[in-house]
Amino acid sequence: VEIAELAMDFVKKHTDIPIVLDPVLVCKESHDVEVSALREELLKFFPYATIITPNLVEAELLAQKSIQNLEDMKAVAKELYDLGAQHVVIKGGNRFSQELAVDVFYDGQDFHILESPVLSQNNVGAGCTFASSIASQLLLDQPVLEAVKEAKEFVYQAILHSDQYGVKQNYDQS
């Protein structure tokens, strides 16, 4: 909580900096009580974030709703927007399609469905890379939707060509 307070002080003082909030709520060591407390802290940041980038599980935890299909993704994106986020992209991965990685972007007015072919290899860290790439594009003054599209393509290409750089196949996270 102390770190969250320091971070909040920073974002309140620097409203001219684009903020990409990647709400990592789930890891092997997390417990329900910790997730609930972290959720409450993260919600406080929504009004200051240029965009939030939860995956499906994180979006479900933040909205406290289940996502079973694309329409649910849209409804949860709208709900997260209504909680104060300026823009929302929910990373759907391949939960609903084995062929396509489907993300939903919402800006308060329009939904945009972003798709790319599913690549199963070397995808550890893809979510963090996606959020970092969005931040980089925003610092280059890209509009938010364009930044998201560029980031999705960047991550796709990075995974697609990762074997050329010696990235180990099927990296074991344990």
Kindly give the residue locations of the regions a language model identified.
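Phosphate-handling active-site elements
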Residues: 111-112, 137-151
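General structural feature for long, well-ordered alpha-helical segments within catalytic domains
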Residues: 2-7, 38-42, 72-76, 126, ...
